[in-house]
Amino acid sequence: MSSIGTGYDLAASTFSPDGRIFQVEYAQKAVDNAGTMIAIRGKNGVVVVADKLISSKLYTDNANPRMFNVNDNVGVAVAGNYPDGFALKNYAYGEAMKWLKDYREPMPIQNIANSVAEYIHIHTLGISRPFGAGAFFMSWNKQTGGRLFLVEPSGLNYEYKAWAVGKHRQAAKAEIEKLKIEELDVNQLVKEAARIIMVVRDENKDKNVQIEMGWVGEQTNGKYEEVPSEVVTAAEEWAIAKLDEDDMDD
């Protein structure tokens, strides 16, 4: 069968003869071609890192962040089309607030991820344009440890130990697989994540980019937080020194 839509890509409700929904595949490409984002679950927390494009020097610092709180204990990081990702974040936040109002307790991370996945599926099923964004959800507590979910533009929802999305996702996954992530604490994960982002960057194309990080773990008392700028800077400096050291060894 042809990989070209040939008329079957005009609506998200239309299957091709070989069972594909081209509109959803196109939405996935919006994530696949976006800046690299990786999320890693370590021994005492979860870290997510995005290589964010800064398209203008006139932007204020940290304009258009990719990472947010859903509630105090769950963070979300959106990849792909920014307005679509922001809409998914708002939906997740609204669901968490309704849960808190109804049950007087924070909405569990798996319920949040499942709710967003179902929303994406129903939205697409209703012959609307698919969301061109994916969303990582992360949490940590003493009972369950770290948890990490990714909801994709198709509505698929999986739990991961670590994962990467974006244009350098395959190279990033290969680097992650070299690490014994279950032995690393969040401070070590921050450094290694910064190193991975720098390793997979295309020096000729990936210019005007900025690393954005979020974490949740034992040291944050289970609260999702943005990684302080001084910690990010220190991680970048460590990563540069590590890469220079590796180059000298080679």
Swiss-Prot record:
CDD domains: proteasome_alpha_type_3
A GO MF label: 3'(2'),5'-bisphosphate nucleotidase activity
First and last residue of the signal peptide: none
GO cellular component: cytoplasm; nucleus; proteasome core complex, alpha-subunit complex
Any matching Pfam family: Proteasome
Keyword set, alphabetical order: Cytoplasm, Nucleus, Proteasome
Single GO biological process annotation from the record: ubiquitin-dependent protein catabolic process
SUPFAM superfamilies (UniProt xref): N-terminal nucleophile aminohydrolases (Ntn hydrolases)
PROSITE patterns (alphabetical): PROTEASOME_ALPHA_1, PROTEASOME_ALPHA_2
Disulphide bonds in the chain: none
Subcellular localization: Cytoplasm; Nucleus
InterPro entries reported for this sequence: Ntn_hydrolases_N, Proteasome_alpha, Proteasome_alpha-type, Proteasome_asu_N, Proteasome_sua/b
Domain of life from the UniProt record: Eukaryota
Role: The proteasome is a multicatalytic proteinase complex which is characterized by its ability to cleave peptides with Arg, Phe, Tyr, Leu, and Glu adjacent to the leaving group at neutral or slightly basic pH. The proteasome has an ATP-dependent proteolytic activity.
Family of this protein: Belongs to the peptidase T1A family.
Assembly description: The 26S proteasome consists of a 20S proteasome core and two 19S regulatory subunits. The 20S proteasome core is composed of 28 subunits that are arranged in four stacked rings, resulting in a barrel-shaped structure. The two end rings are each formed by seven alpha subunits, and the two central rings are each formed by seven beta subunits. The catalytic chamber with the active sites is on the inside of the barrel.
Protein name (Swiss-Prot/TrEMBL): Proteasome subunit alpha type-3
